[in-house]
């Protein structure tokens, strides 16, 4: 049930029934002395570690179960399928965003962090440290999978993001841009203070559309790139798997998501929220 709005106030002075949080300072060195920052970094590290562990293990398990050389002619009918893999990625994002949103904001993705930084939701210091924690967590999560399933991990490609045969580099890049745009646009919409003010259930349900966006994007782009839309996910697998193809395609999974995130931030803040003046300048508040 939506929150009641004071219509008379709106009609009289055109006042808004919600308050936009003040823009984060571009550089906030004072954050380095606050425990809340380090608590958030730990949350991002652990969440990304768990995300990569569960999802990459799901991919490896699916490939093993559908390997005809191991499981016979009926192997193609086994495993969770592409639908199950997409659910693993989307479901884990839903769970982890729900668990960490109150601590770190539940980014779990450098592209999401970049989009929120461009929208002045986080400072440059916090954004860079978040990205470092996410990448380190991803590497550790994939390393756990390899540690538990060493032979299977190497045999089945390590869950690496690579451009599929038959697709051009431009197609792969476009798929990553569009997929990340969908994700980051959903993040902005689900956490919009205007929506939160008018619908009391939105903050609780915000992780659901974000996870569902990840699920839908995976269905569309798994055949093209294996679905990156998360540079930490792609980097973590590339580091542990250490395959030439994974490294040569790595730039696609950084450039594409960062472009998609930037476009989503500009679209939401400059066009959709222009009347709210939600897009602050890049001048420091100091």
Swiss-Prot record:
Write out the residue ranges of the motif NPA 2.
230-232
Stimuli inducing this protein = Circadian-regulation. Expression is higher during the light phase than during the dark phase. Down-regulated by chilling.
Tissue and organ expression note: Expressed in roots.
User: At the top level of its lineage, which domain of life is listed?
Assistant: Eukaryota
Q: Does the keyword Transcription apply?
A: no
Gene3D superfamilies noted in UniProt: Glycerol uptake facilitator protein (1.20.1080.10)
Compartments, record wording: Cell membrane
Question: To which protein family does this belong?
Answer: Belongs to the MIP/aquaporin (TC 1.A.8) family. PIP (TC 1.A.8.11) subfamily.
Comment field on protein domains:
Aquaporins contain two tandem repeats each containing three membrane-spanning domains and a pore-forming loop with the signature motif Asn-Pro-Ala (NPA).
Function recorded in the entry: Water channel required to facilitate the transport of water across cell membrane. May play a role in root water uptake.
Q: What is this protein called?
A: Aquaporin PIP2-4
Native species:
Oryza sativa subsp. japonica
Taxonomic classification? Eukaryota, Viridiplantae, Streptophyta, Embryophyta, Tracheophyta
Gene expressing this chain: PIP2-4
């Amino acid at each position: 049930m939506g929150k009641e709005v004071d219509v008379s106030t709106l009609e009289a002075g055109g006042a808004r029934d919600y308050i936009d949080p003040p823009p984060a300072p571009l550089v906030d060195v004072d954050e380095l002395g606050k425990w809340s920052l380090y608590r958030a970094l730990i949350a991002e590290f652990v969440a990304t570690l768990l995300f990569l562990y569960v999802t990459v293990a799901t991919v490896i398990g699916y490939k093993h179960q559908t390997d005809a050389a191991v499981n016979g002619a009926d192997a193609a009918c086994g495993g969770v399928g592409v639908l199950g893999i997409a659910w693993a990625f989307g479901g884990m994002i839903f769970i982890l965003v729900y668990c960490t949103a109150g601590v770190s904001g539940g980014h779990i993705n450098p592209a999401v962090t970049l989009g929120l930084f461009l929208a002045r939701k986080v400072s440059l210091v916090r954004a860079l440290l978040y990205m470092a924690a996410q990448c380190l967590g991803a590497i550790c999560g994939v390393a756990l999978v390899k540690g538990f399933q060493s032979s299977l991990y190497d045999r089945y490609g390590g869950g690496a993001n690579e451009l599929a045969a038959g697709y051009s580099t431009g197609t792969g890049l476009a798929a990553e841009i569009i997929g990340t745009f969908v994700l980051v646009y959903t993040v902005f919409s689900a956490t919009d203070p205007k929506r939160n003010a008018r619908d009391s259930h939105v903050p609780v349900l915000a992780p659901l559309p974000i996870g569902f966006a990840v699920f839908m994007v995976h269905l569309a782009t798994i055949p093209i790139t294996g679905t990156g839309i998360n540079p930490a996910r792609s980097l973590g697998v590339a580091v542990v798997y250490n395959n030439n193809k994974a490294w040569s395609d790595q730039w696609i999974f950084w450039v594409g998501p960062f472009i998609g995130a930037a476009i989503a931030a500009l679209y939401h803040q400059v066009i959709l929220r222009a009347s709210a003046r939600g897009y602050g300048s890049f001048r420091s508040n100091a």
